[in-house]
Amino acid sequence: MKIANLVFIDEIINNPGMATSPDGPNRLLGPDGGLPEALPPWPSRDNLRVRAVRAVVTAPEGLPLVVVRVDTSEPGLYGLGCATFTQRYAAVAAAVDEHVGPLVVGRHPADIEDITRLIHYSSYWRNGPVLNNALSGVDQALWDIAGKRAGLPVYELLGGRSRSAVEVYSHAAGATIPETLDRAEELIAAGYRHIRLQVGGPGTGTYGAPATRGGYPRSPNPDGWDVQYYLAHTPELFAAARERLGAEVSLMHDVHSRLTPKQAIVLARALEPYRLSFLEDVIAPEHYDRLPEVRAASPVPIAVGEQIGSVPDAVRLIRDGGVDLLRLHTSAVGGLTPTRKLAALAELLGVRTAFHSPGDISPVGVAANLAVDVSTPAFGYQESHTYNDATHEVFPGTPVVRDGYLWPSPEPGFGVDLDEKAASRFPPVKFRFDRWAAGVR
């Protein structure tokens, strides 16, 4: 990628007659008197530069994953970052290739803080899942490069470990309660101690997705959401779970943002006897200003955050008492740099982390989550996903759950690579919810 009017600090040193701005000798002017498009704003101790930034989209499990590759002027030195917004993957890829990349080419890859602030503020209208995912891809890739240059895993750059591995939770879901609990027993046998339970009902499939048409013919609205059915039958799931699975296993539940604040309180109180570790996404993000009152009235810990698309919104959740656990989709807030700051704020205010990490996050994103998980004292839980063989082929070094834990890679950087030849065999397709929505119109 060629950047017009690109001027480096070392060029100025070798050409003292080149113009500088009134702000000082390190604020260079381009030939037309304006600032160059990509400008190292201070002398660097070496000539390493970002030489290319591009998005790679692949779907080895059918879900489009967006990964950003940042190449440097040192042969073989590159970094990878997760920029996955599955539902709008093409918009993120375009933002990376057309807008974000040109801001970064020519910069020294060590200047992560300044580069990410430049990307964030330069668009004028800031935040949102598209631009923040594009930013995240670059941010995480620069951290990956930093680890590789230092010969250290990224978590050692964040202060080192607070734990050797992180406990994860997985999902047990079914069309019926017995089916859900069968799956839960399989997970327990595999070593999981934390399990999120979901069961089908009107308006939902086994996981909260749109239901199979006609699946609940006795419901007044057989193919649509029935909140009364949900409020009545969800406690039955957890009563059966405690009876069958016992008291030791940790249980969670995801509401998928479907309730009003009052309904969320009703559900939380109904679930109190079953000692859930957390209740997730109890209300829609449009109503997050009501979360403090929900949390204050709930006997169950509240976990929210995966639909947050800005750092200020995440700060408000932590600061204002809206959450017990912060469920960030870390790429949607801009990557590792803001995530580590939010984890530090959470630590100071008594909130724990429980980062979003299902199959619509790339293995690179999992490794980035893991770097924060093992280093922050605020860690609570980590969501997990078991990737298929194709994903492991596309992403060598994909983290693997062993006996209910994720273990960080000792390799420099994040320890995850990208086989682009393998990735090309799995082109992206339209997200399944988009296909479903098109089919019901």
Residue ranges with predicted function:
Residues G76, V100, V138, G151, ...:
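Conserved, mostly hydrophobic/aromatic
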Residues N47, L80, R149, H171, ...:
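Ligand-binding pocket scaffold of soluble enzyme catalytic domains
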Residues E98, D114, R269, R275-F278, ...:
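Shared catalytic-loop signature of beta/alpha-barrel
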Residues P153, E167, S250, P301, ...:
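Proline-centered loop/turn at the N-terminus of a beta-strand
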Residues L29, A38, S73, L77-A150:
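Metal- or metallocofactor-binding catalytic centers and their adjacent structured scaffolds
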Residues A165-A297:
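Metal-dependent enolase-superfamily TIM-barrel catalytic cores that perform enediolate-based chemistry
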Residues V66-E74, G397-V401:
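Short beta-strand elements
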Residues A4, F8-I9, G24-G30, L35-P36, ...:
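Flexible C-terminal active-site loop/helix
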